[in-house]
């Protein structure tokens, strides 16, 4: 597979075309951002960990019947993926109150929800990624009603699979965000990544944060937290 021109560069990844029009190469960077790009930094080795962790979890989901864009890992930083048209939604599943949910609704961090809650936000940094409901998404023509139903169904399924897996690692999946895309035939698949950049992961016993919140909140030990969560994942695959 030949890597060709750079198609896109985002906050944490670069995307390249290949000699196959239906496949792309994603290259993970060590760059870190928070608060819609207002805070910037570098986390040494993050790109390697995020690439490998995301690939392991995508394969886990595929085995459980959840379609993803993953094709194969090329090297420690690069992965071959199916070309998709990204739907401009961030889909957030929350099992425990934290982050913006606690801030917006005045709920103390750590409160466990009776059932997982799903939020949609419009992917637009200039607008601050505002929250959307189904009606907003339909009005903006972000997706069809059937697509939104499919995304919601996949999101709940993914949450259940990941919660169960992380529990075996002594880790609590607090919340996480996902992106979905359309393949050429219109079918919906999970895209982007699943990593400590996109998930809140707490040690199940101590509630120590093992994710990008350590960078957001200047808690220190960011590289160690990423390495620890990767170590636990590899031990339980």
Please annotate each region the language model reported:
Residues 111-128, 159-170, 195-200:
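Phosphate-binding core of ATP-grasp and ATP-grasp-like enzymes
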Residues 194-237:
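C-terminal helix-cap and adjacent tail motif
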Residues 72-77, 166-182:
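A short glycine-rich, hydrophobically flanked beta-strand micro-motif that places a catalytic Asp/Glu
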Residues 142-174:
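A long amphipathic alpha-helix within ATP-dependent nucleotide-binding catalytic cores
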Residues 2-121, 233:
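Active-site loop/lid in soluble adenylation, ligation, and acyl-transfer enzymes
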Residues 93, 173-192:
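Conserved metal-phosphate-binding beta-hairpin within the catalytic cores
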Residues 24-28, 124-135:
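Short coil-to-beta-strand
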Residues 38-48, 131-154:
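Short histidine-centered catalytic/ligand-binding loop motif
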